[in-house]
């Protein structure tokens, strides 16, 4: 069976004010689709799905028949809040067909996830600090929200932590618990998931607390499910956690920096991902403009930094690792480029392939493995 890999890139299409106060002038037209050359790592433009407003994060369902995109906005249909859009994925060419859109009931939705049973979509609203759950119909369309949770509180940083800022949602492999890093609260909140009703309830141990001022952003699990890697935006660290799937609780193993010891400039973290092999973890630094590379101890889950690779651009907000684990694509938000690196399977180190693809304000990278014959 022949296959090909398509790459879907979310962009900012309109001006947006971030939590830092910075206003970014979005230059994208919507969702960009490319074909990955599985030998060279080069990207061939396929199409632009125009008219999608600020699709800053994307998620496929498990069948890859449907794609969901947040619309990172502060108002929707005249009310405070953003929205999430559903698309059908054409199986032969990978074209997207708009299905419908629903409000997320919070401002600046920045992350979307589909649960393992493809029955619900989970959205984190960054600016207002909330989580929204939406049922998915059999035809891929979204129904009105089945649950909504508003976070409360603040952190020690008056500029960045004056209120709650939910930044992402991750589920465990058993589909029993949902985890929400909240940058404003310095907490990884834990919810029990009722997959039938699409409801979330605080766990018996409702959160894991990180160092004050750390600002947790994203959580990535090891393929074994035994360890989690929590990236902290504000203090540029990774918290390495052991996970108990029975209770939905975490214990800290250690904390590692994402920046070189001699770096003295300003930088914040963005994304964290585990290689499909489970042997390496990667984290992006915005300011240092690099990818930190770590080797995973397969016995303990602990990390050892093996180096940093410049992303050849500014502000790597996101990156993607292709399903084979051979290539990593870094999205440089402020210099409008997608840069391809080859992953060394033995060391985890990154080597530029020379492929630099122009993409206006790219902020999310997702892959679709498509059968061609």
Regions found by a protein language model. Name each.
Residues 4-26, 70-83:
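Short, conserved, GDST-rich strand-edge loop motifs in beta-rich repeat architectures
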Residues 13-17, 72-78, 127-130, 185-187, ...:
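Short glycine/acidic-enriched loop and turn motifs that connect beta-strands
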Residues 34-41, 87-94, 133-143, 191-200, ...:
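Short loop/turn segments immediately following beta-strands, especially the blade-tip
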Residues 44-50, 97-103, 153-159, 203-209, ...:
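A short beta-strand motif characteristic of beta-propeller blades
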Residues 52-62, 105-117, 152-175, 210-227, ...:
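Beta-rich, blade/repeat-based domains predominating
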Residues 94-168:
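Asp-box/WD-like beta-propeller blade repeats and closely related beta-sheet repeat scaffolds
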Residues 333-373:
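Blade-level signature of beta-propeller repeat domains, shared across WD40, Kelch, NHL, RCC1
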């Amino acid at each position: 069976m022949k296959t090909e890999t398509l790459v879907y890139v979310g962009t900012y299409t309109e001006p947006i004010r971030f939590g830092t106060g910075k206003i970014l002038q979005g230059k994208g037209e919507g969702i960009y689709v490319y074909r990955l050359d599985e030998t060279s790592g080069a990207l061939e433009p396929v199409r632009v799905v125009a008219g999608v407003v600020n699709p800053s994060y994307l998620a496929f369902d498990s069948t890859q028949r449907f794609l969901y995109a947040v619309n990172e906005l502060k108002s929707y249909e005249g009310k405070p809040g953003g929205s999430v859009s559903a698309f059908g994925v054409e199986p032969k060419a990978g074209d997207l067909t708009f299905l419908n859109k629903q409000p997320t009931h919070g401002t600046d939705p920045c992350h979307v996830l589909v649960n393992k049973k493809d029955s619900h979509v989970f959205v984190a609203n960054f600016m207002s600090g909330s989580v929204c759950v939406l049922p998915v119909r059999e035809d891929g369309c979204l129904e009105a929200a089945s649950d909504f949770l508003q976070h409360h509180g603040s952190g020690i940083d008056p500029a960045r932590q004056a209120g709650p800022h939910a930044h992402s949602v991750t589920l465990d492999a058993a589909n029993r618990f949902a985890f929400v890093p909240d940058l404003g609260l310095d907490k990884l909140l834990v919810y029990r998931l009722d997959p039938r009703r699409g409801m979330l309830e605080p766990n018996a141990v409702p959160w894991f607390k990180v160092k004050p001022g750390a600002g947790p952003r994203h959580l990535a699990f090891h393929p074994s499910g035994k360890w989690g890697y929590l990236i902290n935006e504000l203090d540029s660290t990774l918290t390495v956690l052991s996970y108990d799937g029975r209770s939905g609780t975490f214990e800290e193993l250690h904390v590692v920096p994402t920046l070189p010891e001699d770096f003295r400039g300003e930088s914040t973290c963005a994304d964290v991902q585990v290689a499909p092999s489970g042997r390496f973890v990667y984290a992006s630094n915005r300011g240092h403009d690099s990818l930190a590379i770590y080797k995973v101890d397969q016995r303990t889950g602990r990390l050892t930094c093996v180096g940093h690779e410049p992303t050849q651009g500014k502000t790597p907000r996101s990156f993607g690792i292709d399903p084979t684990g051979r290539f990593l694509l870094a999205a440089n938000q402020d210099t409008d480029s997608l840069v391809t690196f080859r992953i060394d399977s033995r060391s985890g180190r990154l080597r530029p392939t020379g492929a630099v693809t122009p993409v206006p304000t790219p902020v999310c990278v997702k892959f679709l493995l498509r059968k061609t014959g």
